[in-house]
Amino acid sequence: MSVFKVERVDYLNEKDAQALVFLLDAYAQDPMGGGEALNPEASARLCQDLSRIAGAASFIAWSEGQPIGLINCFEGYSTFKAKPLLNVHDIAVLAQHRGQGVGQALLKAAEDHARQRGCCKLTLEVLSGNAPAMASYKRFGFAQYELDPAAGQAQFMQKWL
């Protein structure tokens, strides 16, 4: 088991920015991230853009000075609860560090941040074929979203613009 620490990302810090882009690119190239490298233009401006987004929060897991895991979150709002929520937009752990508690530690950092911000819940989406991630999220306390079992579970959809 690797020894690691989780720290909040300073988007304008060069070391943090490079680590975030490195980890996000590794995730993007993974089959569960789409299997393609990040667009170089997006990589170049990502952290500058994130620094301008109110409610953006990222955390990196570091082991021996090397980045090994990442979680990117964005604050949203629950109209039913009239409180903020925190959406986990990306979570990724380098393959050689999976199964060592890194993902759980990243989720804990996000939860702690959400509680400090007065959020009512954490949300995330996961591919149905990503069984290890689904098991990790369930272990952490996530469950399928539904308001009434008779109405079914929520489905995540998108439309490219």
Features from the language model and the residues they span:
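Acetyl-CoA-dependent GNAT
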Residues: 3-83, 89, 108, 147-150, ...
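C-terminal "cap" of GNAT-fold acetyltransferases
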Residues: 3-12, 22, 118-161
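Conserved amphipathic alpha-helical interaction elements at protein-protein interfaces in regulatory
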Residues: 26, 30, 79, 99, ...
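Short coil/turn motifs at secondary-structure junctions
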Residues: 76-78, 96, 129-131
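Short coil/turn segments at alpha/beta junctions that flank glycine-rich nucleotide-binding fingerprints
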Residues: 84, 100, 116-120
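Residue-level recognition of the GNAT/N-acetyltransferase active site
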Residues: 89, 94, 98, 127
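Conserved acetyl-CoA-binding loop-helix of GNAT-fold acetyltransferases
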Residues: 93, 99-112, 135, 139
